[in-house]
Amino acid sequence: MRELRRLLGYLGPYRRDLLIAAVMIILETAFEMVIPVLMADIIDVGVANRDVAVILQRGIQMGVCALLALATGLLYARFTARAAYGWGANIREAQFERVQKYAFSNLDKFETSSLVTHMTTDVTVLQNTVNGGYRPLVRSPVMLVMGVGLSFWMNPRLALVFLVCAPVLGGVLFVIVRRVAPMYGRLQKAVDRLNNVVQEGLTAIRAVKAFVRGEYEEEKFQGVNSELMETSQRTFRLAVLNLPVFQLVMYTAVVLIMWLGGNMVLNSGLQVGQLTGFLSYVLQVMNSMMLISNVFLLLTRSLASARRISEVLDENIVLDSPEDAVEEMPDGSVEFEGVSFKYHSGAREYALSGVELHIPAGQTVGILGGTGSAKTTLVQLIPRLYDATEGTVRVGGRDVREYDLRALRDAVGIVLQKNVLFSGTVRENLRWGKPDASDEELWAACRAACAAEFLERMPKGLDTDLGQGGVNVSGGQKQRLCIARTLLKRPKILIFDDSTSAVDTATEGKIRTALAELRDVTKLIIAQRITSVMHTDQIVILEDGRVHAVGTHESLLAGDPIYQEIYASQMKGGEDHGVPATEC
């Protein structure tokens, strides 16, 4: 319940709507509870004495009560819906804001599909609990108290039937809730797995078709879909036992009251109208108890969702800006002092070990290494996408942990290995680099990245729609747009993470020439092609997470065997791209 109480704090201004809705429910219930008393008067006084005036008077009063109950019920529905959907929107927004603050190490703990489920399905469960459960949560106790009270007022002996039924219903509810509670958690995890398969299959649909793996993906989907179906069936098979058991007890109570009340009517101890009114209260009380049981089941499921949402909100953010953070980076110098790094504290091996490296401001540095040599890991420590496990990373002469995160990352531009574009136009995507960039600035960045040559051929130019993930442009065009977007930031440190692999060597040469014109910008170029880095000021060779060698093209070619092997394989008829393959 602690998690659910905490999430109620996100109601904000919608608390007022819930309070008004509660008042409407109480009024609605009160109007409904008066109707059986009026009905008893019609039978026992109006019909028995053939008093038409009493019948009309009580009939009009019943109609007014019914209309007032209808009006208050409609008002309740309006206020509750506003509160439920407003609450859900606030929780989703809080989760999304929290995820935006996550470091990479935080994101590594969650699957993307799981986060989507947390923000959609789990929030919907909470909304449905308010929409479907708030009414009986308020109404049922009021109806129960008023119904039992009026029943004892009408006939204490018949009302004793409630004292027999209540323990039976309470025991059944306790058993069901205790069994169902853990099953709802498993149900939501099954939804996670289904969403993961769906997302993965749709994201990689081109690869699925290219490898003709449609049947395999269908079988995988059928597996998780069947798991979700079976988990749902097991959960709700037990949950729905609530209804037949409660109906059995309710109808048993009605039969007992009819039998006892009938005998009392025959013995003149009870009037027919009183028995009719009493039966109305019995049905209302029993229905209220059934509704309370449904509320408990709704709360049980919502608790499972609340715990999952709290996992996102309570995730400890491992990277944050310090107090009195430095807001300005003096220059683009980079230093690694005894840096070691592993992705998880419990990991046996380090991804990076004992890295010592000094890169003066304004230098262009190439980084080479085989697959798994931790090239990307190395550069991710510069903008604090991860923190070094041991040692210190310095930028501009200061420990990166002293900088304000936003200021640090604004001063470091990264062109990612995986090209990421968003739905929208070219202009909207480029302005991620500089939101207020003019068209002149956009075109200048595109020319530097050799993107202008294909954009100028497009009828809409910068207003060309890229489609979801940039599906309307080729891989090489995506790379050039990503480069242009990063150049717009005008960073002090520019990192290319194998970011020209999809462009031809001539285009790469033009981009390299444009980059050379950027003064006072430190450029780190991760590459597989030796031609991409041979003209840099220095080249760093990584091997198994360690710095193997540092030097210029000439010095490494003269004295480093790994560099010589790469050069020979790529420049003398070996592999055209990348580090030479090793035997599997």
Task: State what each model feature region is.
Residues 13, 101-105, 121-130, 134, ...:
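An intracellular "coupling" helix at the cytosolic face of ABC transporter transmembrane type-1 domains
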Residues 51, 55-57, 150-164, 234-307, ...:
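Helix-loop-helix
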Residues 49-50, 85, 93-123, 196-220, ...:
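Short intracellular "coupling" helices and adjacent cytoplasmic loop segments at the cytosolic face
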Residues 13, 17-30, 41, 65, ...:
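Transmembrane helices of ABC transporter permease
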Residues 328-584:
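ABC-type nucleotide-binding domain
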Residues 26-34, 67-74, 126-129, 133-145, ...:
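Hydrophobic alpha-helical transmembrane bundles that constitute the permease/transmembrane domains
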Residues 1-32, 39, 47-62, 72, ...:
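Membrane-integrated ABC transporters
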Residues 35, 39, 76, 80, ...:
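Hydrophobic/aromatic residues in alpha-helical transmembrane segments
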